[in-house]
Amino acid sequence: MTQTLDTREDPLNLGGGGGGGCGCGWAHSASLSSWSSCHRRRPGAPAYNRPHRYSPKTEYGPPRKQPKQQHGPGFWFQPPVCSNWGCWGGPWRPPPPGFWKFPCPVQVFRVYGLHPLCFCCCSCWSGSWNPGWVKPPGRKKRWGRRGRGLRHHPRHSYPRSPPADVSTLPRPVKLYEWREPGMRAPPNTTQFIMNQIYEDMRQQEKVERQQEALRAQKATVSGEASPARSSGNDAPPGGSKETWGLQETLYGFVQNPSLAFSPNPEENQSLAPLLVEEEEEKKNDDEEEYDQEVCDAKEASEEEEEVEDEEEEVEDEEEEEVEEAEYVEEGEEELEEEELEEEEEVLEENEQRGEEFHLPLEMPLSIFVEAEEKRENFISCTFLNPEQIIPKVPQESLFMAQDFNC
């Protein structure tokens, strides 16, 4: 007869696991314990090394004693079915509209735990009966538990971009001034480049003209010096004049190679004034062209001004005509208004006179009708005589009043 030593399964030690008071003294081969949903340790297994089939952290420790509360798809809090609170239980709700009093302008502001329909200042600010308005319980932060979720919870949903380099950004545009190295070219870049090229060509032409003028001056000076030499040395030393001239030319070529293809001094003398005259003619032509352009521009501007003056005069005349027409229309309207006002005044005066002038009852009303017909023939009835319109009835019968007191 074997008795179990587990007092939890057999607290009275009656022999036999969970036998209770049945009187069975023999122990069962497997302990008959009540079934439970929570995990229980087998009797022979160690505390920290039990075989958990589906647990990812088998080596760290035992599983949770109670299953973790999982928030399902529905509401995470259901109010109690029945309670002792009666009508004072549940969330705060405003009183019926008959009890509302607003001593001051209502201020609506949000406080944690405040029911969205509560506008008063009372004890319900500390918290509401319905925990549905409170945030569901979150996970408590612990040290060294980063591996549960994201390693670094990002403050921004996008990665921060590095600050932009200001030196690489485009600079503003200068159209009509000297461009700095960092400045952008103007939008019409091709025109700008062509203008620069033409300006360079003009500068080059000017420099070439100056060089030609200097060469002409040098040629004239050398031409003046050569006849003085020939007059001083009448008898050339050895040889004829031709050989002496050849030697001079060769010596001149060796000394100044730029004169190798230069014309004779006489030609130079004749060419120098020609060049000067050509330059003067060119200058005069340029000045004349410039003066002509200026005159043309002035004439064009004067013509434009004349055309504008004529247009302005035409516009002024049209405006004056329109103003005159408007003035005439306004005068006609004023005359019509004055006539209407006079007619209204006459009618009002007639009405007032009629009200003030009390006619006797015996006086017939045909007088006014005849007067109106004479003044303005309102009624033009050819098929009705005035006797038919206003029949002659004895006046006594008109103003007869029956005696009702009889």
From Swiss-Prot:
- Going by the entry's taxonomy, the superkingdom of the source organism is recorded as Eukaryota
Biased segments, Acidic residues type: 278-294, 301-349
Q: Which GO terms describe its biological process?
A: sperm DNA condensation; spermatogenesis
According to the UniProt entry, which residue ranges have a biased composition of type Basic residues? 138-158
Instruction: State the UniProt keywords alphabetically.
Output: Coiled coil, Differentiation, Nucleus, Spermatogenesis
Matching entries from InterPro entries are given as: CCER1 (IPR027889), Coiled-coil_domain (IPR052696)
Organism in which the protein naturally occurs: Homo sapiens (Human)
Q: Which gene encodes it?
A: CCER1
According to its UniProt record, where is this protein located? Answer: Nucleus
Q: Which protein are we looking at?
A: Coiled-coil domain-containing glutamate-rich protein 1
Note down the stretches annotated as region Disordered. 43-72, 138-167, 203-244, 278-358
